[in-house]
């Protein structure tokens, strides 16, 4: 289940995608649950848009697309039917006016809405209006205004707004370029203010805001670099 400000979505056990909203994004939705498509493996939401991936790697979208980030040709007003906007996509993420897609070959692309004054052809495919960010990417998290990527070699990269050191790059300065902050990572989890990495050796590392003891290090001081969080017993197997 995914919950947005004005639209919600669920993928059922049979891989069918259903949405409900209060702004008329879906066909005759009007707050009622409506089936959109079959064979869906992932869905991502913004305030007014729905983007999803099918089992065959096709990327589809519907919504208002006020800024052009999701790549449907009608970039204003209601969009009554989902439109194919890409293919060979493994993972998608939406952050405000930006849509990110990881392709099957590990390439990470970003398409930004016109609020950023990027120039692209509204009639072009999603990928032709996007820019390549990184290679060898297996996972990405985009909580609010910063970005965290896990690459296939286990390295973790961050960029964006650096409130309370949530980038983990050793400073409190914002960064508009991806920077490596830790290696040997197995899994990454992020919130709006702090981040966590589970390493291959089972150790847990965290960084960022710690006003309420979120990091679990026994203090309430933020950390601008990843720090190991020690607990009694054996290592961790996974995290959410």
Predicted features and spans:
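Short coil/turn segments that connect the beta-strands within blades of beta-propeller domains
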Residues: 5-6, 15, 47-48, 57, ...
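Conserved core positions of repeat-based scaffolds
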Residues: 7-10, 19, 49-52, 61, ...
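Short glycine/serine- and acidic-residue-enriched loop/turn motifs that recur at repeat junctions
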Residues: 18-34, 60-80, 109-131, 160-177, ...
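Surface loop/turn motifs at the tips and blade-to-blade linkers of beta-strand repeat domains
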Residues: 34-38, 83-86, 131-135, 179-182
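Short coil/turn segments at the loop-to-beta-strand junctions that recur within blades
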Residues: 39-43, 76-77, 87-91, 136-139, ...
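A detector of tandem-repeat and repeat-rich interaction/domain scaffolds
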Residues: 155-157, 179-180, 186-190, 198, ...
């Amino acid at each position: 289940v995914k919950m947005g400000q004005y639209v919600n979505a669920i993928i059922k056990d049979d891989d069918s995608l259903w949405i409900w909203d209060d702004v008329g994004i879906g066909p005759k939705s009007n707050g009622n649950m409506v089936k959109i498509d079959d064979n869906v493996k992932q869905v991502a939401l913004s305030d007014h848009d729905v983007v999803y991936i099918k089992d065959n790697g096709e990327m589809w979208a519907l919504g208002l697309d006020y800024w052009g980030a999701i790549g449907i040709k009608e970039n204003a007003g209601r969009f009554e039917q989902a439109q194919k906007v890409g293919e060979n996509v493994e993972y998608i993420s939406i952050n405000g006016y930006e849509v990110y897609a990881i392709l099957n070959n590990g390439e990470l692309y970003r398409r930004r809405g016109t609020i950023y004054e990027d120039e692209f052809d509204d009639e072009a495919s999603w990928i032709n209006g996007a820019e390549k960010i990184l290679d060898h990417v297996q996972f990405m998290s985009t909580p609010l205004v910063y970005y965290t990527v896990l690459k296939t070699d286990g390295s973790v990269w961050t960029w964006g707004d650096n409130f309370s050191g949530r980038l983990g790059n050793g400073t409190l300065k914002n960064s508009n370029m991806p920077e490596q902050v830790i290696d040997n990572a197995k899994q990454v989890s992020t919130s709006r203010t702090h981040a966590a990495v589970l390493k291959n050796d089972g150790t847990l590392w965290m960084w960022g805001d710690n006003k309420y003891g979120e990091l679990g290090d026994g203090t309430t001081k933020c950390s601008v670099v990843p720090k190991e969080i020690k607990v009694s017993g054996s290592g961790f197997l996974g995290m959410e």
